[in-house]
Amino acid sequence: MDKSKRLFLKSKRSFRRRLPPIQSGDRIDYRNMSLISRFISEQGKILSRRVNRLSLKQQRLITIAIKQARILSSLPFLNNEKQFEKKRVGRYNY
C-alpha cells in the first residue's frame, strides 16, 4: 500500500459509549430535585439539549419540570450565590 492511501485509513480505537443522562427508571417530575439539578447551570439557566445529550422529548419534559419547580418556589429563577463586584471604568477609581 502506498503512502497516500495509508493516510486515509483510520486506526480502530475502541471507545466507551457514554451512559444516557436519564435512565429508564428515572421519573421526570418537578419534585425530583436531584434529577432536575443536573440539567441546570451554575447561574440557574436550563442547559441546552446538546450539552445535556437528551432526546427532544426528554428535553421538553425536563424544561417543563424545571419551569414548574420555579413557579412553585422549590427552585430559584436565578442563582445569586456569586456576588459580582462593580468595577468603575473611567478616570476616577475610588
UniProtKB/Swiss-Prot annotation:
Record has Repressor as a keyword: no
* An annotated GO cellular component: ribosome
What keywords are annotated for this sequence in UniProt?
Answer: Chloroplast, Plastid, Ribonucleoprotein, Ribosomal protein, RNA-binding, rRNA-binding
Q: List GO BP terms, alphabetically.
A: translation
The compartments listed are: Plastid, Chloroplast
User: Which Pfam families does its entry note?
Assistant: Ribosomal_S18
Q: What is its main location?
A: plastid
Q: Which GO terms describe its molecular function?
A: rRNA binding; structural constituent of ribosome
Superkingdom is Eukaryota
**Would I find Hydrolase among this entry's keywords?**
no
Q: Cite the HAMAP family for this sequence.
A: Ribosomal_bS18
The family annotation for this protein states: Belongs to the bacterial ribosomal protein bS18 family.
- Summarize the subunit comment: Part of the 30S ribosomal subunit.
PANTHER family in alphabetical order: 30S RIBOSOMAL PROTEIN S18, SMALL RIBOSOMAL SUBUNIT PROTEIN BS18M
The protein in question is named Small ribosomal subunit protein bS18c
Q: Which organism is it from?
A: Manihot esculenta (Cassava)
